[in-house]
Curated annotation (Swiss-Prot):
Keywords on record: ATP-binding, Chaperone, Nucleotide-binding, Phosphoprotein, Stress response
Name of protein: Chaperone protein DnaK
Biased composition (Low complexity): 585-601
PANTHER family, sorted: HEAT SHOCK PROTEIN 70KDA
Organism of derivation: Renibacterium salmoninarum (strain ATCC 33209 / DSM 20767 / JCM 11484 / NBRC 15589 / NCIMB 2235)
Pfam families tied to this protein: HSP70
Induction of expression: By stress conditions e.g. heat shock.
Residues with Phosphothreonine modification: T175
Task of the protein: Acts as a chaperone.
GO molecular function: ATP binding; ATP-dependent protein folding chaperone; unfolded protein binding
Region (Disordered): 584-623
Top-level lineage group: Bacteria
Keyword Coiled coil in annotation: no
């Protein structure tokens, strides 16, 4: 049987791990390091360099060296090398191929399967791109797993039998996530790890701390009248020096940045010799640190717990070695010290290897349950966002709802898929649209269209729609450019919180209009079907009320719609009384069913419009 590995495909560094005898082992690369820089370079001779060797030659080959490509995953980013365009997937695949080769050299056998980790807040396009990179590298990607979840898996398996809450604070080179997970273990030693909530920022990481130091050094040179902001080689040397200074300041209170012959100007060579203290470094990056607070607090609020309920805090990612980060986490956790027993660079890959072992049947003592970070739904009448899957729902998951048509003899329905937390689709992010055609001619409210959302274990979304009458079906997989960026997700959640009251009012108004429109339609239908049974004065009065309601619906005054609707509801009772009296007089069967009206009130024949769901599940089962 081929071997499966776990891979942490990081922004700045990557790690590969494998199970040996059921226990995870981190594999050293060909250069002897346990972490491999996520750097790819194309030498002038056409050779592809990956890892430490690529990073070392970057200064002399800056235009042909690519770092931090993870930040471009899921976008249309490309780079031209020797008249050939490379996508982010192709560059990432080079790193994965090196990890695969290093693992094969260590194991002495072929590696074909892998579990690859991604930030918890990676969207659908970014997950798809990561999976594609694995496939380009010749790997069968068993599963895409969220990095904090993998870390908790690695950390939580040796915990006690009581249910425990683990908070994972993951600050990597380019991304940031916070996740809360619950770890339980039964008497037989079987562990269940379930994600309770997750939040993050896909554009925040150690690279941003490095850039602040680079900007500071450039400004120091500018004061002396030297501008190196366009000098690519100087910028690369500054980036490398900034990264090294950041690492040194994790253990020292100051460091010296000395770069001789950084550049050459008409006035001669430029040398840089700058002392950087930890205090100055923390001052330069204080706003970056501040950005980590909201996701932390959001996760606590989303899970509905108190900070004191957290049993363990796990720091993941090399950037968590910065003293200011450790101190902030302790402060946010109410004085609780983060766990120091895990290697923040390796714990994610270890968890990925464990999950690979589970999927290959090498470990049978653990179940991993992950979540989707954002709600998914479709647009229904009135522009309402009807959610089928709520955010932080465990995945894989599948949910179906039955909808209907808004007009008589409607031949097709457009299924518009959205992602977000707002009540109206115009405030959310469109993911895609497809059309279900060939619906049999029928009155509005009669056709039943079942819409199904299916999120697989990788967090990738599939949507289908089926006409229950004809059996016709259409489907699509959400891919590529239609997925959300992290900024979009953050904005949506923030907007949803800020506009919750406004959304509630607008939703109520939409519901009133939808109900009023259905009422006018139903009463109109009763009038036409029972024309010969109704006294003229009743018909005249009710018709006038119907027209008043239609006129109100044509306007924008919500109070007028509500008032006209209430008036028609009152007058429609006369229809029921008149029809009932007429049928009794004729000695006919009760007309309630035919007219759609029980005695005393003409209820709409079926309260189904495009904005409403034919609820096939008990209310308490909806998430």
């Amino acid at each position: 049987m081929s071997r499966a590995v776990g891979i942490d495909l990081g922004t700045t560094n990557s790690v590969v791990s494998v199970l040996e005898g059921g226990e995870p082992t981190v594999i050293a690369n060909a250069e002897g390091g346990r972490t491999t820089p996520s750097v790819v370079a194309f030498s002038k001779s056409g050779e592809v360099l990956v890892g430490e060797i690529a990073k070392r030659q970057a200064v002399n080959n800056i235009d042909r060296t690519i770092a931090s490509v993870k930040r471009h995953m899921g976008t249309d980013w490309t780079i031209d090398i020797d008249d050939k365009k490379y996508t982010a997937q192709e560059i990432s695949a080079r790193t994965l191929m090196k990890l695969k080769n290093d693992a094969e050299s260590y194991l002495g056998e072929k590696v074909t399967d892998a579990v690859i980790t991604v930030p918890a807040y990676f969207n659908d396009a970014e997950r798809q791109a990561t999976k594609e990179a694995g496939e380009i590298a010749g790997l069968n990607v068993l599963r895409i797993v969220n990095e904090p979840t993998a870390a908790a898996l690695a950390y939580g398996l040796d915990k006690g039998k009581e249910d425990e809450l683990i908070l994972v604070f993951d600050l990597g080179g380019g991304t940031f996530d916070v996740s809360l997970l619950e770890v339980g273990k039964d008497d037989d030693g079987f562990s269940t790890i379930q994600v309770r909530a997750t939040s993050g920022d896909n554009r925040l990481g150690g690279d941003d701390w490095d850039q602040r130091v680079v900007d500071y050094l450039l400004n120091q040179l500018k004061v002396k009248g030297i501008d190196l902001s366009k000098d690519k080689i100087a910028l690369q040397r500054l980036r490398e020096a900034a990264e090294q200074a950041k690492k040194e300041l994790s253990s020292a209170t100051s460091t010296n940045i000395s770069l001789q012959y950084l550049s050459v100007t008409p006035d001669g060579p430029v040398h840089l010799d700058e002392q950087l203290t930890r205090a100055k470094f923390q001052e330069l990056t204080s706003d970056l640190l501040e950005r980590t607070k909201k996701p932390f607090n959001d996760v606590i609020a989303e899970a509905g717990i108190k900070v004191s309920d957290i049993d363990h805090i796990v720091l993941v990612g090399g950037s968590t070695r910065m003293p200011a980060v450790t101190e902030l986490v302790k402060q946010l956790a109410g004085g609780k010290d983060p766990n120091k027993g895990v290697n923040p660079d390796e714990v994610v890959a270890v968890g990925a290897a464990l999950q690979a072992g589970v999927l290959k049947g090498e470990r049978k003592d653990v179940l991993l349950i992950d979540v989707t970070p954002l709600s998914l739904g479709i647009e229904t009448k009135g522009g309402v966002m009807t959610k089928l899957i709520e955010r932080n729902t465990a995945i894989p998951t599948k949910r179906s709802e039955t909808f209907t048509t808004a007009d008589d003899n409607q031949p097709s329905v457009a299924i518009q898929v959205f992602q977000g937390e707002r009540e109206f689709t115009r405030d959310n992010k469109p993911l895609g649209t497809f059309e279900l055609t060939g619906i049999a001619p029928a009155q509005r409210g009669v056709p039943q269209v079942e819409v199904t959302f299916d999120i697989d274990a990788n967090g990738i979304v599939h949507v289908s729609a089926k006409d229950k009458g004809t059996g016709k079906e259409q489907s699509m997989t959400i891919t590529g450019g239609s997925s959300l960026s992290k900024e979009d997700i953050e904005r949506m959640v923030a907007d949803a919180e800020a506009h919750a009251a406004e959304d509630k009012t607008r939703r109520e108004q939409a519901d009133v209009r939808n109900s009023a429109e259905q009422l006018a339609y139903s009463v109109d239908k009763i009038l036409s079907e029972n024309d010969d049974k109704l006294p003229e004065e009743v018909k005249t009065e009710v018709k006038a009320d119907v027209e008043s309601l239609k006129a109100a619906l044509a306007g924008t005054d919500e109070y007028a719609v509500k008032a006209a609707s209430e008036k028609l509801q009152a007058s429609q009772t006369k229809l029921g009384e008149a029809i009932y009296a007429s049928t009794q007089a004729e000695g006919a069967a009760p007309a309630g069913d035919a007219a759609g009206a029980p005695a005393g009130e003409a209820k709409p024949e079926e309260d189904i419009v495009d904005a409403e769901i034919v609820d096939e599940e008990p209310k308490n089962e909806k998430k």
